[in-house]
């Protein structure tokens, strides 16, 4: 994904690329193994307290309400209560037919805060560091294109500029004042995937595959975030899982359906909203999942997605595609 054409004009004035990758060595020392799939494999351990910031979705249509839809509103619509370890798909798929269409459209963004949430977060973070003018920002190197406008001249080669190498991820490193976190967000809406101040009083981590952001810091900071009405935050422990989790009510149906898909390549299931037929072709690193759906009372369609072959990705695609299409008004 090349984002070079969307960088703001003041990008280089606010932050600059740096080769001081040694500033991130403390993070690797405090991360749990990437394959542990815990909060502490994304954000470093050792802080007093942690929070998970839930990325909002976008409101459907012009309703006059706020443009962002919080998870609590989705929960209220679906009738599925939120828990401490809630994931979006768990509350977005209702147990029965709803009289109104879902208030949101599309999934929450993964790997980035919205500009509004980033701005609200900055206000809290600034109060809880002694070095707001000296911060470090890591951007996943898979995005590409960030370097081309940072100096107004030819970009420095990625080979020439070392990257922060952490388990499972590599990052371009930038430095600047704390508000540099939003330098990537105008208008491309990408915040750093990993950022912290020089005094290491807190750390913010937006893993590229997650629709929430972790923050580790002092108890006072986390309490500040949990009570910030401009954010939607829940407490989290470093040992909490960050892998895809099925809702308890969905698990038997979709796990059985997934097993059938892997075995037979096709499966049909019935839900409270309609019937779904899934066909899986290909195995190994790449496979294709095609879903046909038919709503009770009318409405049908078909869509496909490409998977990397893992069970969790298959289940996630299965649930996500079923939800998006059966709930479509």
Each model region followed by its residue ranges:
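Short glycine-rich, low-complexity/disordered patches
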Residues: 130-145, 233-242, 257-275, 324-329
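Negatively charged, low-complexity tracts enriched in Asp/Glu with abundant Ser/Thr
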Residues: 150-152, 156, 249-269
């Amino acid at each position: 994904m090349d984002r070079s054409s969307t960088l703001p004009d003041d990008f280089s004035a606010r932050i600059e690329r740096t080769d001081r990758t040694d500033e991130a060595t403390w993070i690797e020392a405090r991360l749990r193994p990437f394959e542990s799939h815990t909060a502490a494999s994304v954000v470093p351990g050792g802080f007093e307290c942690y929070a998970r910031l839930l990325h909002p979705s976008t409101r459907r249509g012009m309703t006059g309400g706020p443009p962002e839809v919080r998870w609590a509103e989705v929960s209220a619509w679906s009738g599925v209560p939120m828990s401490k370890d809630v994931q979006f798909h768990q509350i977005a798929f209702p147990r029965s037919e709803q009289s109104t269409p879902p208030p949101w459209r599309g999934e929450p963004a993964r790997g980035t805060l919205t500009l509004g949430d980033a701005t609200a977060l900055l206000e809290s973070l600034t109060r809880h560091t002694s070095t707001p003018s000296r911060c470090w920002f890591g951007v996943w190197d898979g995005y590409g294109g960030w370097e081309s406008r940072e100096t107004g001249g030819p970009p420095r080669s990625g080979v020439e500029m070392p990257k922060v190498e952490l388990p499972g991820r590599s990052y371009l490193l930038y430095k600047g004042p704390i508000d540099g976190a939003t330098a990537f967000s105008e208008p491309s809406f990408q915040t750093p995937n990993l950022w912290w101040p020089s005094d290491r009083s807190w750390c913010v981590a937006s893993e590229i595959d997650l629709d929430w952001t972790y923050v580790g810091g002092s108890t006072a900071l986390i309490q500040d975030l949990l009570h910030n009405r401009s954010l939607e935050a829940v407490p989290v422990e470093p040992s909490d899982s960050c892998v895809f989790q099925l809702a308890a009510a969905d698990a038997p149906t979709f796990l059985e359906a997934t097993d059938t898909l892997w075995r037979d390549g096709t499966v049909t299931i019935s839900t409270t909203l309609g019937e779904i037929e899934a066909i899986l072709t290909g195995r190994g690193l790449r496979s294709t999942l095609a879903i046909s759906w038919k709503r009770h009372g009318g409405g049908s369609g078909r869509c496909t997605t490409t998977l990397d072959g893992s069970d969790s990705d298959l289940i996630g695609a299965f649930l996500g595609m079923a939800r998006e299409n059966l709930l479509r008004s």
